[in-house]
Amino acid sequence: MNKNKISIVILAAGKGSRMKSSKAKVLHPICGKEMLYYIIKTSRAISDDVSVVVAHQRDAVVESMSRYFNDINFVTQDAINFPGTGGAMKGVNIKNERVLVLNGDMPLVEKSSLDGFLEAQGDVVMSIFNLQNPSGYGRVIIEDAEVKKIVEQKDATLQELKVQSVNAGIYAFSKKIIEKYIPLLQNNNAQEEYYLTDIISMARNDGIKITPLLVNENEYKGVNSKKDLSDAEIIMQDKIKNSLMESGVTMQLPSTIYIEEGVVFEGECIVENGCRITGESKIINSHIKAHSVIEDSIVKNSDVGPLAHLRPASNIEDTHIGNFVEIKKSTLKGVKAGHLSYIGDATVDEGTNIGAGVITCNYDGINKYKTVIGKNVFIGSDSQLIAPVVIEDNVMIAAGTTLRSGKVNSGELVVSASKSRIIKDFYYKFFAKK
């Protein structure tokens, strides 16, 4: 589809007071990305001219979205002098002959449904959806495939109250309609705001046809509260996981699994129940076992868990990570770490075995230090490696060893535990004193 046919304006200037949050509404996350991210991503799929209107927490919104997109026009609304959705359009320069106006709080909108606005004919296209219970909504009265009027519930007749069509709040206009009617908008209403919907009534009064376009309520329903946010995340999770399963990922009890938008799977992968995979994690030909957490990490040809935790910047390949093992900012290749270990700020090479209870002590209260472990190293259970430490290839660390900062040369054995003492009949003597 030709991306030059339509411009898109996304309204993202509002405070979102119903969110009851100090954070701008459009910056609230859904599956790891701000809700505004999704509608921008979808918009860029059909247009080369995308503008985002900002006002409330402008700098935070611009900074956040600039991390993902470098070709978006940010327009700052003069919310003091020109508040409202109509006021938001006053500073926008439209490149193409048609413009689609979207809301920043609609993260679930699909490209396929936006295509309908490109195909619809007419200078003004107005989105509608049908509700089983439209109570509280203004009704859209349609006759002969044309919007005849929009009537608020309090002003509707008994017959009009039976209508289930309501305004979905998305519009497509020809450029000439915007150029003609935006300067004519007035704010003589109770809120003293400039409303984009007034263009509909002005155009209709001038005999211009208003074309209705039926859209999916679940996609176009705005996210206005924390409850809406939760509902949207459930729907988005289903979309993400269904797409992954269709591409070949096996999921056990997918309703218990959480996977964020930026996660990538390649090859044959299995994800068991209760797992959480976030950030820009990449899973390649691997098995993620039950209740494991993976954050911004790469897992290749490996198995992880159950109940393992890969924190950000972990990179494992051809490796076994067992239960209750935590990895942070470390690279492991061809390694076995079966249980109850913490590996942080470390590089561990192939053939190395990490025993139960092994800890890399990487932090002295001020600075972080690296641990480097070579090939074919055997580290016994309950050992502490106090970084900075370098362990060359083919080394053995005895169980219970505390290895203090330094270097261990190839072929060496490190033992720090003293020989155990056995005191005969001590138990009986000790408790006899009680």
Swiss-Prot record:
SUPFAM superfamilies: Nucleotide-diphospho-sugar transferases (SSF53448), Trimeric LpxA-like enzymes (SSF51161). It catalyses: alpha-D-glucosamine 1-phosphate + acetyl-CoA = N-acetyl-alpha-D-glucosamine 1-phosphate + CoA + H(+); N-acetyl-alpha-D-glucosamine 1-phosphate + UTP + H(+) = UDP-N-acetyl-alpha-D-glucosamine + diphosphate. The active site is at H339. GO terms for molecular function: glucosamine-1-phosphate N-acetyltransferase activity; magnesium ion binding; UDP-N-acetylglucosamine diphosphorylase activity. It holds the Pfam family NTP_transf_3. Acetyl-CoA binds at A356, N362, Y363, S381, A399. Pathway: Nucleotide-sugar biosynthesis; UDP-N-acetyl-alpha-D-glucosamine biosynthesis; N-acetyl-alpha-D-glucosamine 1-phosphate from alpha-D-glucosamine 6-phosphate (route II): step 2/2; Nucleotide-sugar biosynthesis; UDP-N-acetyl-alpha-D-glucosamine biosynthesis; UDP-N-acetyl-alpha-D-glucosamine from N-acetyl-alpha-D-glucosamine 1-phosphate: step 1/1; Bacterial outer membrane biogenesis; LPS lipid A biosynthesis. It comes from the Bacteria. Residues 1-226 are annotated as: Pyrophosphorylase. Mg(2+) binds at D105, N224. Its cofactor is Mg(2+). Residues 248-434 are annotated as: N-acetyltransferase. Catalyzes the last two sequential reactions in the de novo biosynthetic pathway for UDP-N-acetylglucosamine (UDP-GlcNAc). The C-terminal domain catalyzes the transfer of acetyl group from acetyl coenzyme A to glucosamine-1-phosphate (GlcN-1-P) to produce N-acetylglucosamine-1-phosphate (GlcNAc-1-P), which is converted into UDP-GlcNAc by the transfer of uridine 5-monophosphate (from uridine 5-triphosphate), a reaction catalyzed by the N-terminal domain. In the N-terminal section; belongs to the N-acetylglucosamine-1-phosphate uridyltransferase family. In the C-terminal section; belongs to the transferase hexapeptide repeat family. This is Bifunctional protein GlmU. The lineage of its organism: Bacteria, Pseudomonadati, Campylobacterota, Epsilonproteobacteria, Campylobacterales.
